[in-house]
Each structure stands twice: as C-alpha cells, then as structure tokens.
From Swiss-Prot:
One of its GO terms (biological process) is negative regulation of DNA-templated transcription initiation. Residues 5-52, 81-124 form the SpoVT-AbrB domain. GO terms for molecular function: DNA-binding transcription factor activity; transcription cis-regulatory region binding. Forms oligomers. The keyword Transcription regulation applies. CDD domains: MraZ_C (cd16321), MraZ_N (cd16320). Keywords: Cytoplasm, DNA-binding, Repeat, Transcription, Transcription regulation. This is Transcriptional regulator MraZ. Belongs to the MraZ family. It is found in: Cytoplasm, Nucleoid.
Amino acid sequence: MFRGANAINLDVKGRVTIPTKYRQSLLDDCQGQLVCTIDTQQPCLLLYPLPEWEEIELKLSRLSSMNPHERRLQRLLLGYATEGEMDKSGRFLLTAPLREHAHLDKQIMLVGQLNKFEIWDHSVWQQQIQQDVATEQEAAFELTERLQDFSL
C-alpha cells in the first residue's frame, strides 16, 4: 500500500526516482515493472505496479468499442500507457507525452494512493490541495452514501 506525498525532482532525462521506502515493495510485488498513464479527470499521471495495471486493462477490455464514451476512455488510458522497469537506482522514465499532459517540470509530487501513485507538478499539486481543502471546509456539496458512513 502506498501512502504519503513525496516532493521529488525529475532528472534531465525525465526520470522520476521512486523513494527508497517504496522500492523493496515494488521489487517484491512486481519486480519493479510499472505502468504509467494519464488521469483523465486531473492534470496528473497515474503510476501502477504492473499487476494492478493488468486488472485495469482487463476492465478496459470489457468496455464496448461501439460506445463513444467507453471507447474514448480506452483510447486515453491505453494510448498513454507506458510500461517500464525501475532501474537499479529506483528511477522510472516518464515519456515526453506523459510529462506534457501533467505539465511536469523539475519539481514534482509523488502521492501514494493505496494501490498506485499520482504524479503531479509541485505547484499544480499545491493549488489542487488548497482547492480540495477549501471545498471540504465549505461543505457545500452533497455527501455520497459511502461518505455519509465514513469516519476517521
């Protein structure tokens, strides 16, 4: 399980260095094989261990290519999906199209989301968090049934 927000830097080749605390788990669970794709709702990337991504691919394969909404989701997620392996230094290459989608510069955030990571540009992440906190504090939204039963 991945949790926490980690401020890290992209190197000049566009590689993200996975923090040490996650590396052994990724090596044990998937031999460092990762898949990165875009988030279709946010200006960030989604980085999955290969077995987690394969479950998503299975779900995507069940969508209808005749339904334009389902086809669009397949096109975006699969079209941007890039498989790679962490190198011995724990680095993973983010391709130029992926970096462009998320507006990634040198400073980025790697954010654990249980079974995957989100990758954000540092300044975009800060703006998103401020917006999310403000929305939660306003409570000007309707709680879903699941959230009504959720407590911390």
